[in-house]
Amino acid sequence: MAIALSGDHPFENTPSLEAKALRINLNDNIYGTFAEIGAGQEVARHFFRCGGASGTIAKTMSAYDKDFSDAIYGREDDSRYVSESRLNKMLDWEMGLLEKRIDRTKNKDKLFFTYANTVTTIDFAKKFKGHGWMGIQFQTKPNEPYSTITTHVRFRENDTKSQQLSLGVMGVNLIYGAFYQNDRPKKLLQYLFDHIDRDSMEIDTINFTGPLFEDIDNRVLSLELVRLGMTDAVMFGPDGNNLLPARELYKKNIIA
């Protein structure tokens, strides 16, 4: 137990990025896949570089080419690749493969997860800074139904490399938060920006679903994004789930 001295004030000690990835890797039961398409090719490497990944990473998928991505996950009705629909297809498809290929009778204690992202970074003309969807489907007890966290981010940095690096850090924070902060979703939101400059990215949509989050009101978390300065505006639907404002208001007439 750490020594406490008179006059001390409580504070939270933020684990380093390497410590977060290593804690995941050193857990005997956490086991899953990474699927990253488009420009978001940075998350899995943190888990490889910190060591101990052989018992954690079942597979990494990098489907950069659009035709190859369509061949795996199917073509979207709107032909978009950076979308919530594509992200959910990736999560479901990769989890299905994991369940199919890993014998549960031989791996009774395994906690399966799938992390996925689909991202576009800043364009050559630097007019469109880029955005992306990322998410994780996971369980904290063997054979329990999966819970899911999905989020949409917008980049504010002005070069591709910086955007990719920031996304990689946030991906590690999301995976770590899913397993070790799922009982405190509001805190989990804050931890997504560990080791990231708040001005580098914006989170404008996040949804928590599944058995771990049955008592969570996503509308409250949506407002928390605004309170924390992670975004300027949020939107949610009648079902209580958060919506992407840019998508819902695209080409719509608005009266304010």
Stretches with model-predicted labels:
Residues 2-255:
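Non-catalytic terminal extensions that flank enzyme cores
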